[in-house]
């Protein structure tokens, strides 16, 4: 009986050692598997992050496309506010392309729509200035009217005048007014001298010169 009990105890201890060893091996395998899975998860996460960075990287091409998108959206909103549509936008682009070909035509925004405005060349400005000078010279030769003022019949042709020629015309007009004032002052002084001379002559005529009576000799 004692031998049987001893054998049973020894067998139980062996079974316990085997179970402990198997449990340790299982725990080690489980730990290694968890470590491997963690490494795999980290690797997959880093791969996903790198792919996301590649997709969201800001390049020059994306920057240019973004700017084009902003420009087109701004133009669409502008024309929607102005009451225009896509057809007007295409027409505007055609008008702008044609306006660059013409040297004297410019496209401006007036009353909510694009319009062509013709600006005259420098030759038209020269013609206008020469016409103004011609009328000014002819005005000097014209007599005064009943009120003592000169009659101005100058007409400026053309819708748009050059800025420089306008300044020149204003300066010429100012000089002309000064010349008119000087001429009027000269005429007034001449009239006064003429009146003074007339008064002197009338006084001379009205003077009574005493005449000595000479008695004849007998």
From Swiss-Prot:
This is Cold-regulated protein 28. It comes from the Eukaryota. Together with COR27, involved in central circadian clock regulation and in flowering promotion, by binding to the chromatin of clock-associated evening genes TOC1, PRR5, ELF4 and cold-responsive genes in order to repress their transcription. Negative regulator of freezing tolerance. The lineage of its organism: Eukaryota, Viridiplantae, Streptophyta, Embryophyta, Tracheophyta. Residues 20-37 have a biased composition (Low complexity). The keyword Magnesium does not apply. Residues 1-51, 166-218 are annotated as: Disordered. The gene is COR28. Keywords: Biological rhythms, Nucleus, Repressor, Transcription, Transcription regulation. Disruption phenotype: Period lengthening of various circadian output rhythms and affected central clock gene expression. Derepressed expression of circadian-regulated and cold-responsive genes. Delayed flowering under long days conditions, and slightly in short days. Increased freezing tolerance. Induction: Regulated by the circadian clock at warm growth temperatures as direct targets of CCA1, with highest levels from noon to dusk. Repressed by CCA1 at the transcription level via chromatin binding and in a temperature-dependent way. Induced by cold. Induced by abscisic acid (ABA). Transcription is repressed by blue and red lights, but induced by darkness; by contrast, present at low levels in darkness but accumulates in blue light (at protein level) due to transcription auto-repression. It is found in: Nucleus. Residues 186-207 have a biased composition (Basic and acidic residues). It comes from Arabidopsis thaliana (Mouse-ear cress). One of its GO terms (biological process) is response to abscisic acid. GO terms for cellular component: nucleus. Its main location: nucleus.
């Amino acid at each position: 009986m004692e031998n049987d009990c001893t054998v049973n105890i020894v067998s139980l201890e062996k079974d316990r050692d085997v179970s402990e060893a198997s449990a340790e091996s299982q725990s080690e395998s489980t730990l290694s598997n968890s470590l491997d899975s963690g490494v795999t998860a980290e690797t997959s996460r880093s791969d996903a992050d790198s792919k996301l960075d590649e997709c969201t990287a800001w390049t020059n091409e994306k920057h240019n496309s973004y700017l084009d998108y902003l420009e087109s959206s701004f133009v669409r909103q502008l024309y929607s506010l102005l009451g225009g549509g896509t057809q007007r936008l295409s027409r505007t682009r055609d008008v702008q392309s044609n306006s660059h070909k013409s040297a004297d035509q410019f496209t401006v925004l007036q009353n909510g729509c694009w319009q062509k405005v013709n600006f005259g060349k420098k030759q038209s400005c020269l013609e206008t200035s020469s016409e103004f000078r011609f009328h000014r010279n002819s005005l000097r030769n014209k007599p005064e009217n009943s009120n003592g003022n000169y009659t101005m019949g100058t007409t400026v042709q053309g819708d748009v005048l050059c800025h420089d020629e306008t300044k020149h015309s204003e300066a010429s007009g100012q000089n002309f007014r000064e010349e008119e004032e000087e001429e009027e002052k000269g005429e007034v002084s001449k009239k006064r001298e003429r009146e003074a001379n007339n008064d002197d002559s009338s006084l001379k005529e009205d003077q009574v010169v005493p005449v000595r009576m000479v008695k004849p000799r007998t």
